[in-house]
Amino acid sequence: KNPWSVPYWQNLEEAYTRAMRNKGHEFSVGRVTYMYDGQHLWYALPSGRILCYPFAKLEADGVTYAKAAWKPAADATEWPRARLWKGLACENITQATANDLLRHALRQLDDVVLHVHDEIVLETDRPEEMAEQLERVMCTPPEWAKGLPLGAEVAIMSRYGK
């Protein structure tokens, strides 16, 4: 249980709601910034990557957006809508930031054969050396994530497994 999580969620909700009410203005929470352009709700991650809740609307019960990842019915005239709530906003930021960290690590490594969620798999004839490098790379945050505590559990295996 993290005592900062509930206030952070509330601050996120306040920021994206204020952005929806103030077209063209930016509202930040920590290192995340929201901006509504009149059609889409955009948010900038600490890495600088920009993500979007498409066709966002401020409704009586909160913010909704077009859930483009869902396949609509064949006769549907528009994408289904989903409700943006503070926990989902936090989850989206967390998952996207984790992805940015993974991609940062991948760009620094040779011998990568695959990655699964938060795991990186290397194939090498220098396992001990590469295990040390992998841990060092995965535990060193990029400039935009300075101060973020990172950890990695590295294992040497003859084939991929859990």
Predicted regions and their residues:
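Conserved catalytic core of nucleotide polymerization and phosphodiester-bond processing enzymes
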Residues: K1-K162
